[in-house]
Amino acid sequence: MCKYLFLLLLCLGTLAACNSDDSVFKTSPTTRAQEAVDALKQRLVSAPYGWRVLYFSRTDSLLYTQPDQDIPQTLLRGSYGYGGHCFTMRFTADNKVEMRADYSDNTATTPEVSEFSINRNSFTQLSFVTYSYLHQLVNERFEGSSDWLFMGTDPDGALMFRTAQHLRPAREYIRMVPLQSPEGMAEVVQKSVENRQWFEGMLNPQLRIHQGGRVYFQSDYFVKRPVETNASLLKEIKDKRYYLFVFVKQRNPIPDYPPKSITGLGSGYVGTEQGLTFRAGLRYDKKIQFYDFVRNGDKFEAELVEVYDTQLRTTRYVSRHLHPEGRVTGLKAEIWDAK
């Protein structure tokens, strides 16, 4: 009797599981795909003032991230990575997008209107279907793409995208945050250009990472020496938006000769309305990594605080000006002009 009762309960449980599965997939794949498309479009369109978009089309999380490793000076030219670009975008229900870009003062102030579409295959895809400022990055040099795959939101609620351009992880960075005022569409890009140009105008930028009196890293090499043999390197820094902060491990006893041994930390950069953002970041080690700097007078500064990551259920370090409520760590970084 107990045996039959057990079989009956097992059958009932199986039927319940089947009914549960049916309720999970109560809509067709076509309907679910359309719902995902509609949800992303509604989200993009519903931001009344538009979006601030940071796009690093090609990054390398391993390039110049080992401050104890010697750097052959023959590799300084031609070995730099690539930085990012700042856009503002406003999407409308009729599939139009108004865009500004940080390429120049003109593109920062002159809006360009193009068309976008949203489709669904394996991912929900945002496509910029007619020519826009973004397409200036869609080439072999920058390896950009006009088709963005929606990956969800980060712990701060920003929209995160990737492209099919790169198969390996951490090779690009696309982040969208809603603007907070009607003036943001114009002012954010203009300010990002101003901050980037201020950094690029530094004659001898140096980086210091410290915690109280303990210095983890401090660059001291004059990378941007204004000599004819340095012209190609100076052009590469500006064109690629990448900077390498160099520390001299062993100086040359012969005056005015290149040092015998150097090391450094490098990253691509982009100007923001608050200062600078570096990706893949100025990464001293797995823990001490600086991404977002705020401009303070003639310096760029960052202070790391600890916050709880609700997605990963662990703590992470972020810049204090983005999370003033975070726990103070005392880890700071400054970029200044040692001219």
Model-predicted regions and their roles:
Residues D68-F123, V215-A280:
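N-terminal glycine/threonine-rich, aromatic-flanked beta-hairpin/loop signature
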Residues S23-T30, A158-R208, E306-K339:
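Edge beta-strand at a domain terminus
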Residues T14-A17:
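C-terminal motif of bacterial Sec signal peptides marking the signal peptidase cleavage site
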Residues N19-E115, F123, E183-F199:
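Acidic/polar, low-complexity intrinsically disordered N-terminal segments immediately downstream
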Residues M1-F6:
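Bacterial N-terminal signal peptides that target proteins for export
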Residues V129-S146, Q289:
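A cross-kingdom feature marking solvent-exposed beta-strand/loop segments within repeated
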Residues G184-K240:
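Elongated scaffolding segments in large macromolecular assemblies
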Residues S23-G50, T272-K339:
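Hydrophilic extracytoplasmic domains
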